[in-house]
Amino acid sequence: MDLKLCETITNAFGPSGFENEVAAAVQAALPAGSQRDAMQNVYAPFAPLSGKSVVLLDAHLDEVGFMVQSITANGLVPLGGWVEHNVPAHIFQIRTRKGGMVRAVTASKPPHFMSAAERQAPLSMDSILLDAGVSSREQALALGIEPGCPAAPEVAFSYNEATGFAL
């Protein structure tokens, strides 16, 4: 297994609809003549070996992510679309329109600011936000964060040689 290639592809930013970086990493690892279409599908024809089977490798390039839909007055970005319990305390990358990346952490109302009823209620996606360290909508916009920007969890490839397990 080529662990460096696995690391490059794993660490590439690629939420659904924004797979360009992952597709470029895959294409760079393939022989000359590979092609990429407008939908970021990567094609790499290989000459069949005489008498050998031909195999088609078909895989998704995208990862689960979010799309910025709005920014609150205090610069936070509301999230939606995931199972609530998988989201808290994650670091995310938000890709700006100009291609830059802004790190943000998922945040929700701290327990010491919650009422007793709020502390007892199940976590809801409406209460989870991305905090990029700004204090206003204007500051978020100045960083390049705006509706339509994709966001995905920040990942770092890791490999456990003892178990052969890669993350």
PLM ranges: what are they?
Residues 1-167:
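N-terminal hydrophobic/helix-forming segments and targeting peptides
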